[in-house]
A protein has these predicted regions:
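Residue-level structural signal for beta-strand termini and adjacent loop
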Residues: 64-65, 142
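Carbohydrate-associated surface elements
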Residues: 68
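N-terminal glycine/serine-rich phosphate-binding loop of ATP-dependent small-molecule kinases
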Residues: 1-61, 77, 89, 162, ...
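Short capping micro-motif at the N-terminus of alpha-helices
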Residues: 61-62, 139
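Gly/Ser/Thr-rich active-site cleft segment
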Residues: 87-207
């Protein structure tokens, strides 16, 4: 997947459409195998990266890759407003400059047009399952990598969202591993030769 990172104007992005194409091609190959019966599909990826989705359901920009340098120093900037101890107490997540919390705060401080226009924010596995099903969800384990989830309530922490200018409504419904996300869209069924196979939420973070 590293080959699907590209650099443009000094920033690193994922080509999410190319990742989706790989998934569709893989499903096509699997559908042709007579000795394989596909009963469900699950997607996991690396953590922290996300896609901004517009009101029309389209992606507003290719997602930044966590290797992008724009978050250098971002934690220190955030901790001038919210104490580090509070953030760690809520989330229990190791502070790293590329965590979604700091990516989002960097975009907010830079008046990023995609974030400003975002109706929904989808983490990478949820963005890919959305492309397969048309359903927008937020899977718990992938959300936990964002440093936005309260480890006690298992919900997004409002105090952090408020600091980012976001609300719970900016995220898809919460799902947990084993929950049903939806079924393949008619378009994906036509492209792959598969039927209405369910997409099931798995532990979406690859090291969960």
């Amino acid at each position: 997947a590293a080959s699907d990172v590209y650099k443009r104007q000094g920033h690193f992005y994922w080509d999410i459409y190319e990742l989706y194409r790989h998934i569709v091609e893989g499903l096509k190959l699997a559908a042709r195998k007579e000795d394989v019966e596909i009963t469900s599909i699950g997607i996991d990826t690396w953590g922290v990266d996300f896609v901004c989705v517009g009101k029309d359901g389209g992606f507003l920009r290719q997602p930044y890759a966590y290797r992008d340098p724009h978050t250098m120093g971002a934690p220190d900037a955030f901790f001038t407003r919210v104490p580090r101890s509070h953030v760690y107490g809520w989330t229990g997540i190791q502070v790293m400059n590329f965590n979604s919390l700091f990516q989002l705060d960097t975009l907010r401080r830079n008046h990023d047009s995609a974030l400003t226009a975002a109706d929904k924010i989808l983490f990478m596995p949820d963005a890919l399952s959305y492309m397969l099903t048309g359903e927008m969800v937020t899977e718990y384990t992938i959300a936990s990598t964002a440093q936005l989830v309260n480890a006690n309530t298992r919900k997004l922490e409002d105090a952090l969202l408020n600091e980012l200018g976001l609300t719970q409504a900016h995220f898809g419904r919460f799902v947990y591993p084993g929950d049903r996300v939806g079924v393949l869209t008619k378009e994906v069924q036509r492209m792959t030769g598969l039927g209405d196979i369910p997409v099931i939420a798995v532990a979406g973070h690859d090291t969960a």
